[in-house]
Amino acid sequence: FMHLDTVLSQIDKNEYLIYDSEESIDCFRFNESNPDGEKITFNSLGEVVSKFDNKAKLFKCEQKEQWTCGSNALAVSPGKILLYERNKMTIENLTKEGGYKAYNPKDIIDGQYDQNEKIVVKINGSELSRGRGGARCMTMPLVRG
């Protein structure tokens, strides 16, 4: 995989979009008492996330949509995300399993949504995907106050 954003995006406080392949993952933990690091092997990316967030709710991105950045969402605020519209299975999973409502950008601009609900804004991005990136990895992270 190119980088972490292509397989994992945090979309709310304890919610993650994830492409969780069957591959084991080696992680390394470093701290002051162990500056050389400690290798920890996990069976999957989902296991890694659950280890560090015991309240994690994982929304799966199918392999077919991983290539089109189905797990690469931009969270503009907790529970408010942008995702390529072509990732229909991922969006369906978010609406059925996560209580998200899917909108087109025009609906958001026109104020056709409830600000208290979790939303996924379906963006076209057909030209952006040619650069092999999704909404999250094509932006600069911001620190929110």
PLM regions and their residue ranges:
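Histidine/cysteine-enriched polar flanking segments
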Residues: 1-145
